[in-house]
DNA sequence: AAAATTATTTAGTTTTGTCTAAATAATTTT
DNA sequence: AAAATTATTTAGACAAAACTAAATAATTTT
């Protein structure tokens, strides 16, 4: 597998993420995601097409090729292993890891990453609950549902938090919700879409729709 | 302290290393050290001068300013901490650490490095025996002498190996010489400048001038 | 179906870091 | 002290990655 520049890697990773949702990715979406200009996206897309990492016809959207997908998984593996390292070994808080991992992910020594993986004990998920691809690019694909769509009375476990800001971390810490927390929705209120939830045998409490939207759970 | 590009950092580090030896650094020396062309060096020197990291008059040599020296120590700190991490935690061998650290050193989060330092237990020297600057840029300055200049009969401890190749590591492992080994020169042979040395109470053995040149020791 | 709006691409610049070839300065040899 | 050699700088080009402004294509509104 060839080596790509940090810039190319950031584009590849963004396309991978966006195409999970929409199937195909547009110029404007990418420009917005990467905080760059549409014209810059077009330039880079031509380059990545030439390198056979993606397919696209002018004015249609982009899609990674099989090879492009493999490259993306490699970058995501590096990113999430570093995040795990920062949180677990260096005691970074949850909201601090992403920014640093955004740089570390571009150091591409295969040996470094495989040894790091081993040192960390082959973790399956990063500090936000996102799965870490293994050395062959395989990763866990457990069915996760948004907390807002969990039916009342169904026990579930928090598996993933999307938003990685300091603000959401503060709130989650206050509410004592972390990845792995087992909870149940008691009631859904139509007016403001807030949820009443219960953790274990503790008294139930309320969380806002905005918060619930960012929490994914798995059925148990 | 501002942020510098990987390229600028590699130049700064190289100047720092070379000026330790010669006091001042020339265009050709730098070009050779960095495997680049003299014209590229001149370009970069203008840039670093503009940023007040070095002093130079055309056709004289270069010297880092005080600020330039501080920046250099920061890069060296990152480089050596990563080398220590790779060797100690990830079990890289001695000859493999430098190349990877050459990339990792350019990830410049201060918090990352200070936490890494703490995680590693504030190590004083990297795997080759070179001192690691602390968070304030201070580092050990123990007097080291080349093994070829150690007088016969004076006990000393191996503190440092300059050459970092796989080849020298193989030889040192075979001879059971590592950093920290206590030894004594028994005899120096004029003909080929080979040395007879003894480790502890074991039988004495011979090492070549080429090998001895790359080993530094400290008196005990 | 035209017109208006929105999305995307193209054209032309800019910055950073590199290179080759040519010019000039400094040093060494004769 | 010239001449020859070596070191350094300058001039001009190039590639990567970004940007702005203008052109064009696609979509939506009227
Ligand atoms: Mn992340
Ligand atoms: Mn990144
Ligand atoms: Mn090194
Ligand atoms: Mn480097």
Predicted regions and their residues:
Chain A
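Short alpha-helical segments that sit at the start of domains
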Residues: 1-12
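Short acidic, hydrophobic short linear motifs in intrinsically disordered regions
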Residues: 21-31
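Key DNA-contact positions within bacterial/archaeal DNA-binding proteins
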Residues: 39, 95
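Short, hydrophobic-biased segments on the C-terminal half of alpha helices
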Residues: 45-46
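Basic, amphipathic "hinge/linker" alpha-helix immediately C-terminal to the N-terminal HTH DNA-binding motif
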Residues: 60-79
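Mid-protein regulatory/catalytic core that forms ligand/cofactor-binding pockets
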Residues: 105-211
């Amino acid at each position: 597998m060839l080596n790509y520049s940090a810039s190319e890697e950031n584009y590849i990773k963004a396309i991978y993420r966006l195409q999970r949702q929409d199937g195909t990715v547009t110029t404007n979406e990418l420009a917005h995601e990467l905080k760059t200009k549409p014209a810059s996206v077009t330039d880079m897309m031509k380059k990545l097409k030439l390198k056979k990492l993606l397919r696209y016809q002018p004015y249609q959207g982009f899609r990674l090729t099989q090879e492009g997908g493999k490259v993306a998984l490699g970058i995501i593996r590096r990113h999430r292993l570093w995040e795990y390292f920062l949180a677990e070994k260096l005691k970074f808080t949850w909201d601090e890891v992403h920014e640093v991992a955004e740089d570390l992910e571009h150091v591409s020594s295969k040996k470094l990453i495989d040894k790091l993986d081993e040192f960390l004990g082959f973790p399956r998920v990063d500090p936000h609950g996102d799965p870490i691809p293994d050395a062959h690019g395989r990763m866990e694909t457990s069915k996760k549902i948004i907390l807002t769509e969990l039916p009342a009375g169904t026990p579930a476990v928090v598996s993933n938090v999307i938003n990685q800001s300091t603000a959401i971390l503060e709130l989650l810490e206050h509410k004592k919700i972390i990845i792995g927390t087992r909870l149940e929705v008691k009631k859904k209120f139509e007016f403001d879409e807030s949820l009443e939830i219960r953790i274990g045998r503790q008294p139930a409490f309320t969380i806002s729709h905005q918060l619930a939207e960012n929490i994914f759970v798995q059925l148990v």
